[in-house]
């Protein structure tokens, strides 16, 4: 079964071809980071217009890359939500229109399920069940994953996501968009112990997170420095901030594995690309004889490959339904069912 995947939930246009027998055949991505950088964040209208320009050319590109044509497709998967309404509508409209013209089935994929399953695209993927850390600009969640569509929420952020805290800290430090990579690069120049920030809910006894207080603590620290906030001070704050976030995430992940009795952790989402987080998780897991699985770096952020894969996994068991142009900008992962 050959599935075309379309991702257009925010500021990346991702296309991919996944074959259930041969695996990932081709993928392509256009990022809008440069376009939105001048505004310090994503402008929804600009994002939608750019998806319109990019989706069909990228579709042709992945088909050529794989030596396939539209006639070879067995189905089309697209991101139905959550995300920006206009951006989702672009991908949905193109997917459903193509499918209607080719008489193909479609499946709307939950964006977060795509992220959750992205590590399964890698060689030697983990077997079910496992614990998943989904950590991005919009979500910070721990889940027990027993099968595709069988997700138990173990812990969630009570306020802001880790990725949002990275972006806010980047703005406070005068760094460029997107904030996560910029903070990480600056943190490499920081010195341990030069300043202190709290570790929110580190010892809360549950698996929930909170990062709003950490953002406030960074703001307070920046204001305390005032005119003395030079490059050295900024690097030290970035270092301490990254240490705080990664320490909390690592401890909660180890607790989730211990509480569930599982020994496999997968990490997905944009913050999952953070090198310091990977280092801490790998060290902590090695001490406890756990295994940690990550998607390749390019699949940590939004991409078409994860949508093609998730769609293929569900489409193998799904009945063909009526074509629908409905998008779900807000969509709880708990609402998903097994295929």
Curated annotation (Swiss-Prot):
Positions bound to Fe cation: 111, 115, 302
Residues where substrate binds: 134-138, 167, 180, 274
Keyword Signal recorded: no
Keyword hit for Ribosomal protein: no
This protein's UniProt keywords: Acyltransferase, Cytoplasm, Iron, Metal-binding, Transferase, tRNA processing
Pfam families in UniProt: TsaD
Enzyme class: transferase
Reaction it catalyzes: L-threonylcarbamoyladenylate + adenosine(37) in tRNA = N(6)-L-threonylcarbamoyladenosine(37) in tRNA + AMP + H(+)
Subcellular locations according to the entry: Cytoplasm
Main location: cytoplasm
GO biological process: tRNA threonylcarbamoyladenosine modification
GO cellular component annotations of the record: cytoplasm
E.C. numbers: 2.3.1.234
Cofactors required: Fe(2+)
Single GO molecular function: iron ion binding
Disulfide-linked positions: none
Bound cofactor: record note: Binds 1 Fe(2+) ion per subunit.
Family under the similarity heading: Belongs to the KAE1 / TsaD family.
Function comment: Required for the formation of a threonylcarbamoyl group on adenosine at position 37 (t(6)A37) in tRNAs that read codons beginning with adenine. Is involved in the transfer of the threonylcarbamoyl moiety of threonylcarbamoyl-AMP (TC-AMP) to the N6 group of A37, together with TsaE and TsaB. TsaD likely plays a direct catalytic role in this reaction.
Name assigned to this protein: tRNA N6-adenosine threonylcarbamoyltransferase
